[in-house]
């Protein structure tokens, strides 16, 4: 698992929706941002720096700007001395409000990128929080194929040559959608959600032995692919081994841990004659039912227990007399 960071320059140059413009501190554009949370200094500007989150991006909204621009030069100098006494990665003023000259001077001297945006504070925080959540999410790479089947994101795993790509190709031909083939990039966006995607280089492509590299979007159309998908089920394809037990009732609920998240796991034996694509389709539909609270295996088990209990009572009519 990796915990990536992001440079201030990435925010400035790669996210036009933020509307950022650099005013000072260009030499600090390589500063790393390692936290998705942001901070509005607010009370800290009055001199209360207890628990000041200096390692976060500092956002100056209308309130902060109104406060510092209403101070006397002496007060503002004191505010700047205290505020810039902390190690800061970058400062952003929203609503297009220009920071006072003393802020620009300190940022230029200390190498702290100082930027402004015409976007409102609320909208800006919403935008940048989403960007940071996606960019800083814990991530890992996993060998397999990620495909959307009936709206369920399924990660097909298994040894090389077991038939993952061929199974996925058959599913795509049936109208389902490819997300990633061979290497799946997985990110944890929350405590219980994993998103799978593909690298830009491999996006929309598959490798099929005997055919080579295929562009799925060109062959099957734009509706056959998507860029990312929530991972809700792992189907592990295994070669059939005599004597090995596989779940035959569905009462077991095995899971596999990915980035600290437990994902439902199904092990499917592969042998000549088995229609794996239709098994995957059925597993997807069954997973949708389970999300709605319906579990066929448990319902059948309850009916069977009631049937056996009823039969036992009928065979022993004097037991309750």
Curated annotation (Swiss-Prot):
Gene Ontology biological process: regulation of carbohydrate metabolic process
Reactions this protein catalyses: [HPr protein]-L-serine + ATP = [HPr protein]-O-phospho-L-serine + ADP + H(+); [HPr protein]-O-phospho-L-serine + phosphate + H(+) = [HPr protein]-L-serine + diphosphate
Region annotation Important for the catalytic mechanism of dephosphorylation: where it falls in the sequence: 269-274
Region of interest (Important for the catalytic mechanism of both phosphorylation and dephosphorylation), residue spans: 206-215
Pfam families cross-referenced by the UniProt entry: Hpr_kinase_C, Hpr_kinase_N
Entry annotation: catalytic residues: 143, 164, 182, 248
Sections of the chain in a coiled coil: none
NCBIfam families per record: hpr-ser
Additional facts recorded: Both phosphorylation and phosphorolysis are carried out by the same active site and suggest a common mechanism for both reactions.
Protein name: HPr kinase/phosphorylase
Annotated organism of origin: Leptospira interrogans serogroup Icterohaemorrhagiae serovar Lai (strain 56601)
Gene designation: hprK
